[in-house]
Amino acid sequence: MLKKHPFITKDELERITKKYPTPFHIYDEAEIMRRVRLLQKAFSWNPGFREFFAIKATPNPTIIKLLRDLGCGCDCATATELVLADACGVTGSNIMLSSNDTPPEDFKRAAAQGAIINLDAGGDMLDTLDVALGGVLPDSICARFNPGGTFESANGIIGNPADAKFGMTEAQLFETFRVLRDRGVKVFGLHAFLASNAREQDYYPKLARILFELAVRLHRKLGIHIG
């Protein structure tokens, strides 16, 4: 487990409060940049890699612009966040809409901005997307997978996907991708979020294995390309 250490001393904070009244948030710009670059270096083997920052985590325009300048995209959950991403200069496929119970207006805005749409469900949500876009689906669509059960690391259970309302079962995902394939979608993406605030070192390797193995099954059964 990673240990957290303050990046500023008590004396420095007291000096800052003499100029800026509390409450306020303070960020370590240099450390943010260092960590983003470390992440990008770790995935440099993949020339198509891009980190998408979840705006809901810190909807701060200064932070979003800093991450934009470092090559990051934005993960949005609402129309408001889509507007914020656009206002911060993040455009097109550098934006992803990952939402639940999405209204048609959000789908319309995402499509107008050229964002990648990440479906949380098929069925009614797919129907809503279809109506919102006038029956013309984008060439690329992503979908969220929920494998169910529990998600364990070396330190024990860190997530309970079976209890989460987000994402599709494998059967639902296959059916949704089959429908999308038959409707002309060319490139498919996979997304999964199985635990909040996961800091265990084996979380992402295990999650990556789940998604890569699922991608192989989807390709073999449906003949689709997981981009």
Place the predicted regions along the sequence by residue:
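A charged N-terminal "starter" segment
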Residues: M1-L119, G123-D139, E175, L180-D182, ...
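Short beta-strand segments
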Residues: A54, S140-N146, H191-F193
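Active-site loop/helix belt of alpha/beta enzymes
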Residues: P147-G227
